[in-house]
């Protein structure tokens, strides 16, 4: 657990001096999340070791909660540094915003994802608020009610079919995911005869508006612009993770007309050690779908049975931004 803690906490700590001291400090979060992660993935051997799948990790939840609390501190600090009277010059503000966005997309997102799968209501609530403060609260319902049930099929908006580039995917999923999740939550509320105030989308939309209002009151219009830019950066990475990890993989239809059960061959995985620790083992994605409630340190990786990405997950996200390059690399792997 110590390695998870060190690799995830350090970039969060760097945001403080980046915002308050500026200078070279302003560039360290983005350097850590790009150059350092890439270099360390190259230097450290791929990690295919597996912990005991039945083992318990008492410290794992404490780290999630701590990183969840850090998310809100990092968000407030980054917005102030980018849009407030921090004394940073334009380049430093841009670098800080970019670094913070990467932290939210590659640390906050995997942490919030783990939290919304927990059985403890407080932990699920924390994960919901993490997504909500990135204006992506609907992802909670879409992920739990749609993605995990229909992954690898046309009913899951977040499972990209072969040949769909990321930009078309992003435009489609942004609309479909929100509307489908809201419809399902409304139907659940009606069946359960819950008052409208308990509709999850009241939290997602209301919480997002409250965050916007708080930023506006504190830092004005420039603060809102900075917040929206950082949130959009994080949202793109949230969508990118699903795009990369499920691109072109489809569940077969059985003789009885039903889809085959979700298996280890329905997600792309990456064995690269440093970025996997950074993202609390999110690149071990197949096992998460097969064993949804397995603690992240115990997620299994089997390169013989699970589809493997040719490069680390963050690098694959960059490649996906160039459709021709992405298709040339991934379509043959999908066909194989």
Residue locations for each model-derived region?
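Cytosolic/stromal cytosol-facing helical appendages immediately following the last transmembrane segment
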Residues: 1-16, 120-123, 127-128, 132-201, ...
């Amino acid at each position: 657990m110590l390695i998870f803690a060190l690799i995830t906490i350090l970039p969060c700590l760097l945001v403080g001096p980046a915002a308050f001291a500026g200078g070279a400090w302003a560039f360290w979060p983005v350097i850590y999340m790009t150059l350092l992660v890439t270099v360390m993935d190259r230097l450290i051997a791929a990690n295919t070791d597996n912990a005991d799948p039945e083992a318990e990790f008492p410290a794992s939840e404490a780290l999630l909660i701590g990183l969840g609390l850090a998310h809100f501190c990092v968000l407030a600090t980054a917005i102030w540094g980018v849009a407030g009277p921090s004394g940073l010059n334009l380049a430093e503000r841009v670098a800080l915003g970019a670094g913070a966005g990467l932290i939210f997309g590659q640390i906050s997102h995997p942490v919030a994802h783990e939290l919304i799968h927990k059985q403890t209501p407080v932990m699920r609530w924390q994960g919901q608020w993490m997504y909500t403060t990135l204006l992506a609260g609907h992802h909670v319902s879409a992920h739990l009610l749609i993605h995990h049930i229909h992954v690898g099929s046309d009913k899951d908006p977040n499972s990209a079919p072969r040949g769909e580039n990321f930009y078309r995917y992003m435009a489609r999923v942004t609309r479909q995911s929100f509307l489908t999740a809201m419809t399902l939550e409304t139907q659940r509320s009606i069946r359960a005869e819950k008052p409208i105030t308990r509709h999850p989308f009241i939290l997602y939309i209301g919480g997002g508006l409250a965050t916007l209002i708080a930023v506006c009151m504190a830092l004005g219009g420039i603060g809102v612009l900075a917040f929206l830019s950082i949130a959009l950066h994080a949202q793109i990475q949230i969508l990118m993770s699903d795009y990369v990890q499920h691109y072109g993989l489809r569940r077969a239809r059985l003789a009885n007309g039903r889809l085959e059960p979700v298996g280890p061959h329905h997600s792309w995985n990456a064995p690269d050690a440093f970025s996997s620790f950074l993202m609390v083992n999110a690149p071990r994605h197949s096992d998460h779908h097969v064993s949804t409630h397995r603690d992240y340190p115990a997620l299994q990786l089997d390169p013989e049975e699970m589809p493997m990405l040719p490069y680390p997950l963050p690098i694959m996200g960059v490649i996906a931004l160039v459709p021709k390059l992405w298709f040339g690399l991934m379509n043959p792997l999908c066909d194989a």
